[in-house]
């Protein structure tokens, strides 16, 4: 038996008998450390003849690799044994109930959008969408709001800067969802019935206004449409949305550039104990604006105003959500407060429909 065979037997036995990782590390250092026996023998190769160096060097490399492999295998074996021992002392009762997790809730704005969609879909309205960054033409000119019109200042618009040297009118963050109506008429022509819910932007911030809020606007274009049709649609909407058997609306003459005639719409209500009651009492509450679509708006959208007529209406989604669900501050809608959302939110899978009830 050669000296290397003796060395091999010594360390293979020491590795096999190592009781823990600390003892195994001592064996590794004794064999392969900087001052280990195998490492020292590797240094002696420089003192040997080329023939001896070739033979002994190959044998030492094989021994070193074998010892290293044995060390790794033993280390893994010790780790597996430690894990088995720990698992034998630990146990889990799989019959115990799981930890409760809070279920997510639907934001009131999303809920009200779904309610609006359910109501107007039942009346034959489709949902239309459009870009939130709009051209000056779609947001103003096509809606009978020319550059000199004072309504442009009233909107407190967010204008988007163009590149230096570009003299075209700036794009804007849309101030209403009315541009969607223009795009829908251009794409589909007449007749048409659509609602356009979505985000709009104006530079305003207080308890009842935020720089970004949500609107829904409705449009119906057909032959022989009148204010009577508008009144019926709005009454049916309010009855279904506020979930009351009857409502009474009051139309007050107003002015909007894109409708003629125009009317603000109030709903009969009362306040009792800090709660709003729709359809009863002696009070009136403004909820939306409406009117017959201006002939210039129809013409701008490519619809012949001599052949087609229509009505339009618009309301703030956040506002009617506040009224229906008793939410006092509009700013809370956008503060991402989980406590607020858990209080005012809705069950994720309980989608509103007219048959089962809108809010449950």
From Swiss-Prot:
Binds 2 magnesium ions per tetramer. Its EC number is 6.1.1.20. It is an enzyme of class 6 (ligase). Mg(2+) binds at residue 260. HAMAP family: Phe_tRNA_synth_alpha1. Tetramer of two alpha and two beta subunits. This is Phenylalanine--tRNA ligase alpha subunit. The lineage of its organism: Bacteria, Pseudomonadati, Pseudomonadota, Alphaproteobacteria, Rhodobacterales. The gene is pheS.
């Amino acid at each position: 038996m050669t000296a290397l065979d003796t060395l091999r037997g010594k360390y293979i036995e020491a590795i096999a008998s190592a009781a823990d990782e600390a003892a195994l590390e001592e064996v590794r250092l004794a064999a392969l450390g900087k001052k280990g026996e195998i490492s020292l023998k590797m240094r002696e190769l420089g003192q040997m003849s080329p023939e001896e160096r070739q033979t002994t060097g190959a044998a030492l490399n094989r021994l070193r690799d074998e010892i290293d492999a044995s060390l790794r295998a033993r280390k893994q074996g010790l780790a597996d044994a430690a894990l088995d021992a720990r698992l034998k002392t630990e146990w889990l009762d799989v019959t115990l109930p799981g930890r409760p997790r809070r279920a997510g809730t639907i934001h009131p704005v999303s809920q009200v959008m779904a309610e609006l969609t359910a109501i107007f879909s039942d009346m034959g309205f489709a949902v239309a969408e459009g870009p939130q960054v709009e051209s000056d033409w779609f947001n103003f000119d096509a809606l009978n709001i020319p550059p000199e019109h004072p309504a442009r200042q009233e909107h407190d618009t967010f204008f988007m800067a163009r590149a230096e040297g570009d003299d075209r009118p700036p794009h804007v963050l849309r101030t209403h969802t009315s541009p969607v109506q223009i795009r829908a008429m251009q794409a589909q022509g007449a007749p048409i019935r659509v609602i356009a819910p979505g985000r709009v932007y104006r530079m305003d911030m207080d308890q009842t206004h935020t720089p970004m809020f949500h609107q829904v606007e409705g449009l119906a274009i057909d032959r022989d449409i009148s204010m009577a049709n508008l009144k019926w649609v709005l009454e049916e909407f309010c009855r279904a949305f506020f979930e009351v058997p009857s409502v009474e609306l009051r139309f007050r003459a107003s002015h909007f550039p894109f409708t003629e005639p125009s009317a603000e719409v109030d709903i009969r209500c009362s306040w009792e104990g800090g709660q709003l009651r729709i359809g009863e009492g002696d009070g009136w509450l403004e909820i939306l604006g409406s009117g017959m679509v201006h002939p210039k708006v129809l013409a701008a959208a490519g619809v012949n105003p001599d052949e087609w007529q229509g009505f339009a209406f618009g309301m703030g989604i956040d506002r009617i959500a506040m009224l229906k669900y008793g939410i006092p501050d509009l700013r809370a809608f956008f503060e991402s407060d989980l406590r607020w959302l858990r209080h005012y939110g809705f069950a994720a899978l309980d989608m509103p429909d007219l048959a089962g009830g809108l809010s449950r």
